[in-house]
Amino acid sequence: MEENIILDKSKAFALRIIKLYQYLCESKKEYVLSKQILRSGTSIGANAKEGANAQTKADFNAKMYIAYKEANETEYWLELLHESGYIDNKSFENMYSDCKEIIKILAAITKNQRGGRNK
């Protein structure tokens, strides 16, 4: 199978998000923010996968841009979980770093596809 960096990274990140969700629900009894980060954090890879299998360039562009927006939303939920004390510094820094890397990759993809109109 051909390597696709964004698919690989977003899937690995989604698996970490699932573990974070389980931890937050089981250990911290937190159900609201955890559901939000589960939805957005797993949606990144789902949209990237759909984009990778798109039938048209327009569909590819749309799916990758949605993945980009979901990654930015996930970054926000990570910040809230950290600042509210639900996740420790080490967990936050590792996941935040991975999230920022995914955002940069998706920003580059969407910038190239949109002719530089993205951030």
Annotated model-derived regions:
Residues 1-46, 50-119:
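Short, C-terminally biased terminal segments at protein or domain edges
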